[in-house]
Amino acid sequence: MALDPAKQKAIDMALAQIEKQFGKGSIMRLGEQMSRLNVEVIPTGSVALDVALGVGGLPRGRITEIYGPESSGKTTVALHVIAEAQKMGGVAAFVDAEHALDPVYAQALGVDIDNLLVSQPDTGEQALEITETLVRSGAVDVVVVDSVAALVPKAEIEGEMGDSFVGLQARLMSQALRKLTGAISKSKAVVIFINQIREKVGVMFGNPETTPGGRALKFYSSVRLEVRKTETLKSGQEVVGSRTRVKVVKNKVAPPFKQAEFDILYGQGISKEGSLIDIGTELNPPVIVKSGAWYSYGDLRIGQGKDNARDWLRQHPEVAAEIEQKIKERLNVASLPVKYADEEAGDADV
């Protein structure tokens, strides 16, 4: 629709004044550059989770919260995102507020620990200041904060053990996120906050679980992932890993409430080969054919039982890469097979 020439001239002058005062790109027409509407992502290292997210990974320029019970795989998922970013030539930082990062495990997951920036801050304020500085540099692609529960305000650290500091951490997070959100959007960084789970006292109905740090992170996060261990994986009598379910509780860049399941193997992290087998057999027609206990790819019989098929793919990375490429070529991310989780009323309260 053509605007009145006088009105168009007034708008152009206003846009020019805004750009002169605040910089180029501070205001634009939404459809001016279609490329801006495409969501840039960093893969998670799990094909199944990339599918559930709907866009192929975690969106750049956005905040992601990963939460769940202890030892459910939260840090493992975050470390895989770091590894994927580094493979793409990106720079990653890990703000270790829990002082619990294991460099040997990180390296086993594919993280280049020689080039990983690590900080172990003393206070919550220090951790969030470091995060802001890294984001504003514009040179860091992924920043992981582990964890929100460990971001202890300076006043609490300097106070006595029995002192009460109600709402102090929530106010700290709220203030920090107000400052961070604009900088994150401009820098195109993926900022991941790992969080724990607490239980609200006296809840009779609904979900009693909540996450520490107040409500601000829930609002500012574009993606929220709930990570839970569903079963233990065994090889004979030996425990070798766990089956993990990740539910996309909130998603501002694609439809939410999808879920992904994958194997986390001890000492190896997310089994990419296992995810390929899961998705490859679910496609119609399947990329990987399951006949009885045997798995086949084309004319190749890749193993009897999932464990053997997974080991075979690990030993033949060129075939695994070919299968992954076929899956990506066959279907767009949005149309890949995903399982929808039940939309429970209690999810909004976590």
Curated annotation (Swiss-Prot):
One GO process term, biological-process aspect: DNA recombination
GO cellular component: cytosol
Binding site for ATP: G68, P69, E70, S71, S72, G73, K74, T75
SUPFAM superfamilies: P-loop containing nucleoside triphosphate hydrolases, RecA protein, C-terminal domain
Major localisation: cytoplasm
Domain of life: Bacteria
Keywords, sorted A to Z: ATP-binding, Cytoplasm, DNA damage, DNA recombination, DNA repair, DNA-binding, Nucleotide-binding, SOS response
Function of the protein: Can catalyze the hydrolysis of ATP in the presence of single-stranded DNA, the ATP-dependent uptake of single-stranded DNA by duplex DNA, and the ATP-dependent hybridization of homologous single-stranded DNAs. It interacts with LexA causing its activation and leading to its autocatalytic cleavage.
Name the UniProt record assigns to this protein: Protein RecA
Protein source organism: Symbiobacterium thermophilum (strain DSM 24528 / JCM 14929 / IAM 14863 / T)
Gene, per the UniProt record: recA
